[in-house]
Amino acid sequence: MTAFVILHYRAIDTTRSCVKSIRALAGDKHIVIVDNASPNGTGAALAEEFAASPDVTVLLHGKNDGFARGNNVGTRWVCTHLDADFTVVLNNDVEIPQHDFIPQIARIYAQHPFDLLGPDIVSVFSGIHQSPKTLHGCTLESVRHKRACVARSKNPILLLLSSGEKNSPAIWRLVQIRNRKKQHIDTTQPAEGVVLHGSCVIFSQRYLARHPEPFYPKTFMYYEMEILDWLCRQEGSVVRYDPSISVLHYQYVASKMEYRSIVRRSKFVIDCLLDSLDAAEALILASEASEPEGAQPVNTIALADA
């Protein structure tokens, strides 16, 4: 069986479309919807809608816990109630048009056993292939550098420029293409040791057996996958990207409902990202403080052969 954990917030039609796409997939599956305390009552509406559906479970979480803790509620439920070979954690604004998505996951695992697996993620907003996010995991230095850059973007003028980019698919696409070219990311080839995009990530049973709540809980939103990748590197877990499986990502649906103003939305992203970067720095510093003297840091796994 393959479990699907969908984090729901406000956008009920988007969640329904996600569920519909999963139900159309070949293979044995169970869908778990975690409602992150949607203030518009859509969590309760989904619970009533799927009450008689044996293939769907709706969990009404009592508070909006953000991405990491909200998804952890779902993965913990899967580990407790289901015998799932794989657990797919995906945003409610993701759809899976690939009919053999589930059999392909099993095929990939048989050939290349993994702890985490990421599909090719195509942004419907910009057309960009979003995964892998980067070829290199975060370090203390990179976290501090990114935090300084993000903090500068709180400048009102830079905030307006950033908001304009994100409001225009054409401009955002050009910015993302430029950034990804700098990193030499080839989304057409399988890879290991890369940072996956968090809108859709697949956990193997062996990984969730060790970490039933896989996401670092001291974040609300953003930078979760960089932190998860760092944790995986510390214990030598296998993180794989494989473009033979693919999903579509309809971005910004829930945040657009929450924040009609693109400037307010951008400020929310910046504030959350700064909090997550603070959490990442504290985690890395705590790890370094606990390392035995003379211990060598874990290196990032090299790009895998196709």
Predicted regions and their residues:
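A conserved acidic beta->alpha catalytic loop
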Residues: 12, 21, 35-44, 63
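Short beta-strand-to-loop acidic/aromatic patch adjacent to the donor-nucleotide binding site
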Residues: 83-95
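Short, acidic, metal-binding catalytic loop of nucleotide-sugar glycosyltransferases
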Residues: 20-29
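A recurrent flexible, glycine/aromatic-enriched loop bordering the glycosyltransferase active site
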Residues: 155-169, 182-203
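A short, conserved alpha-helix in the catalytic core of glycosyltransferases
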Residues: 186-187, 194-213, 218-243
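Conserved donor NDP-sugar-binding/catalytic core segment of glycosyltransferases
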Residues: 95-133, 138
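N-proximal low-complexity "stem/linker" segments adjacent to membrane-targeting elements
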Residues: 1-21
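Glycine-rich, basic loop-to-helix element that forms the pyrophosphate-binding segment
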Residues: 61-81
